[in-house]
Amino acid sequence: MAAIGVHLGCTSACVAVYKDGRAGVVANDAGDRVTPAVVAYSENEEIVGLAAKQSRIRNISNTVMKVKQILGRSSSDPQAQKYIAESKCLVIEKNGKLRYEIDTGEETKFVNPEDVARLIFSKMKETAHSVLGSDANDVVITVPFDFGEKQKNALGEAARAAGFNVLRLIHEPSAALLAYGIGQDSPTGKSNILVFKLGGTSLSLSVMEVNSGIYRVLSTNTDDNIGGAHFTETLAQYLASEFQRSFKHDVRGNARAMMKLTNSAEVAKHSLSTLGSANCFLDSLYEGQDFDCNVSRARFELLCSPLFNKCIEAIRGLLDQNGFTADDINKVVLCGGSSRIPKLQQLIKDLFPAVELLNSIPPDEVIPIGAAIEAGILIGKENLLVEDSLMIECSARDILVKGVDESGASRFTVLFPSGTPLPARRQHTLQAPGSISSVCLELYESDGKNSAKEETKFAQVVLQDLDKKENGLRDILAVLTMKRDGSLHVTCTDQETGKCEAISIEIAS
């Protein structure tokens, strides 16, 4: 049997397969190993990938990008609000759910984000089937460490809707370590690994402890203000200023011209990871005027120096948060396409001069390869070199129960603080007046790192038809068990009568 690993990022998606004892990325039908996570809608078809991205200049209002940023979120979510404000494809709330409004001229339809993600997963499945055949559908999906329960559920549902059998969701930094077999080279030793992931829209950092082949997340941090798109935008703004200098026209207010410059800047950025200079030529950029500009790597590095500095300061901040110094880190794993940038790699080497920088696997392929290896482990491949590796995932957010204090005000009790090693089990006793016949246990999550954190309800358990008591309180015992994949099982039992209700919030099948 064979297995599949899929990484759906904000700007791109990548699929790897495990077969015959090896894991590797599969190229799509265009010959590319990474597929743009873009879906375009036309009158008669849905286009996924590079063709959708290339057509966005002509069809921007019906082209969905960065769907991962809105998956499983509500209109009240600050990140969803930011996404809605920036999206060129109209996002509205319909029947309490966020929907893309697609107008192809013939009809207007409303598409939910999960369906967009389903199309991308279908493209990944089609790509995997090109080498494995149509019977291989077992998959491990990667998720960011800071994804909440609703985001994980939405991602899993989209993958299942595409026809995948989801074995597990795995956190991205754990997948990165699996790809390099970290923990197997010195299975009895203890080491600290920094996973540096610079993706299309964000910078994610994780410090992982590897001890006797066991992985544990010590700390993690994500900055949504640093990503590959920010480097591209910086270069695009420079190109716009060069056009203005040469032709006395400011095109920064022209959306079509700026999209052309952004596309050219993205190509140049990729070229500058291997070349000393890149040429940006645009035919008829503005009012019939062609634009030809050569950008050196040195110029690119100078323009982006504030972004490089932010990346390094983010690393220092995460180390300080753990009381670590650079000497406490044994290896650095590079992930995400933008971590290919030579200047950034050099700055990381300067910060960790005695540390091995792992980049032999293409950074945008590391995470899906790790997911494919995990899938191979789960379906019982006996000849995997990392078959004995064991990961301990951690809860990414605080998990809380809601109660009331003596004044009647809401009070939250944290049962699983962020960073709790999984699996884990907690008990909580909820007291309720004996005069009521139903009791509700409400579950919330919050970002424990945020001083202005907000609790978000994600589930509840209701005990109904309880016998009323004239006096006193009733005790309800809640037992919460969180599995390694982050799924949660909750039982609530009336201690006096034994009446019980249970729910499971499943993350992977």
UniProtKB/Swiss-Prot annotation:
Pfam families: HSP70. It is found in: Cytoplasm, Cytosol. The keyword Transport does not apply. One of its GO terms (molecular function) is heat shock protein binding. Keywords: ATP-binding, Chaperone, Cytoplasm, Nucleotide-binding. The keyword Chaperone applies. GO terms for biological process: 'de novo' cotranslational protein folding; chaperone cofactor-dependent protein refolding; protein refolding. Its main location: cytoplasm. GO terms for cellular component: cytoplasm; cytosol; membrane; nucleus; plasma membrane. PANTHER family: HEAT SHOCK PROTEIN 70KDA. Acts as a potent immunoadjuvant, capable to interact with antigen-presenting cells and generating efficient CD8(+) T-cell responses. May be used as adjuvant to enhance effect of vaccine G1F/M2, a candidate vaccine against respiratory syncytial virus (RSV), a major respiratory pathogen in newborns. May also be used as adjuvant to prepare antigenic fusion protein for the therapeutics of cancers. Component of ribosome-associated complex (RAC), a heterodimer composed of Hsp70/DnaK-type chaperone HSPA14 and Hsp40/DnaJ-type chaperone DNAJC2. Belongs to the heat shock protein 70 family. Component of the ribosome-associated complex (RAC), a complex involved in folding or maintaining nascent polypeptides in a folding-competent state. In the RAC complex, binds to the nascent polypeptide chain, while DNAJC2 stimulates its ATPase activity. This is Heat shock 70 kDa protein 14. It comes from Homo sapiens (Human).
